[in-house]
Amino acid sequence: AAVAQAIADQYSPKGPSDNCPSSPVSMALALAEKIDILVGFFGINEKPTGSKDPFALRRASLGIIRLVIENNIRIDLSVVINYSVSTYMNFNKKKLNVDDLLNFFWNRLKIYAKDKNISHDIIGAEFSWDFVKLLTKANSLQNFVYTDDGKNLLAGYKRATNILHAE
């Protein structure tokens, strides 16, 4: 029954309003399927460009981000992607720039964070391929910035920066 449910859920989430799978088998299959699609298409240099995304790679990457965050899965995405690349035995690795794929994910994460009302600057202040850890820290930092102490810290930093630029 778990395998049948996982097969039914493997393409979820299909969009921002679709539910993420929550059973371990379903999550594993959905993550594996999406990572394989991204690595495979980036491996043959089929990347989204501008408004063109015929293979729904943006949706797949946002699906991975949502699966990881909404199910509190603590994984290092860069390790998972590098492992996936290594499983392609006859794969022309020269065509696949892993950094391009990781940057693609980073940009998708910034869009996800923006949709969750997390400032771009806050996301940029902390870097981690563990998205759960990253968003937890970003939320904490964003909450702090809006307190009186946070505003005072930013004002002091701005003053110090202006003094240094003036000299």
Per-segment meaning from a language model:
Residues A1-E167:
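Amphipathic alpha-helical "coupling" segments that flank catalytic cores
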